[in-house]
């Protein structure tokens, strides 16, 4: 194989990590286009994610808000359940954009959390594996997200899990998503409290 390096003076050979070989293989590029998945009207459920980022969170779901075919703009909603004595539901809107550098790269922007970059390591009509950019210093190396479409939640998707193991950090959490796991969970009350209203007036500039 051309990617295996051996020398006559040594009885050993050097093999690159499988992920490195696959990501550079032109035959694999066709499996790294995330946009058919991200523009799908199906609800998407997060199955795997970095343990560090998903503490006390479950049932992460993304729904399509808008897909403009002419401009390529994609907007989705992402909601999740905060685990506690009284579970509550939060949500944010996310703008998704591609980059000129590569079709596999995705930038996600929110007003609450700013912008974050991802690189697609695998995508098909059933699942999507996104690796969080290595420029994100707060997440472990090779951290990934595995998203699954709602119709395939009960499918083992062994190939998706296998590729996640090949490309991604094994220190992950399995959210074990179930269809409609968001039903019956109250939305987080974001209304300001009476104390908050009183405090907010103390910093007003004089008129």
Predicted segment positions?
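A beta-rich soluble binding module of mature secreted/lumenal proteins
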Residues: 1-207
């Amino acid at each position: 194989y051309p990617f295996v390096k051996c020398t006559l003076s040594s009885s050993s050979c050097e093999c690159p990590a499988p992920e490195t070989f696959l990501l550079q293989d032109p035959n694999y590029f066709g499996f790294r286009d995330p946009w058919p998945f991200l523009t799908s009207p199906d609800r998407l459920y997060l199955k795997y994610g970095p343990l560090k980022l998903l503490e006390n969170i479950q049932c992460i779901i993304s729904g399509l808000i808008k897909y403009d075919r002419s401009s390529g703009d994609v907007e989705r909603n992402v909601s999740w359940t905060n685990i506690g004595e009284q579970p509550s539901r939060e949500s944010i809107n996310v703008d998704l954009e591609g980059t000129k550098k590569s079709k596999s790269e995705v930038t996600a922007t929110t007003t609450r959390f700013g912008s974050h970059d991802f690189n697609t390591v695998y995508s098909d009509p059933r699942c999507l594996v996104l690796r969080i950019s290595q420029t994100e210093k707060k997440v472990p190396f090779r951290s990934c997200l595995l998203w699954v479409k709602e119709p395939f939640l009960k499918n083992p998707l062994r190939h998706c899990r296998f590729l996640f193991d090949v490309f991604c950090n094994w220190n992950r959490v399995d959210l074990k998503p179930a269809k409609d796991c968001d039903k019956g969970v109250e939305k987080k009350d974001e209304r300001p409290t009476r104390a908050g209203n009183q405090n907010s007036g103390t910093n007003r500039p004089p008129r």
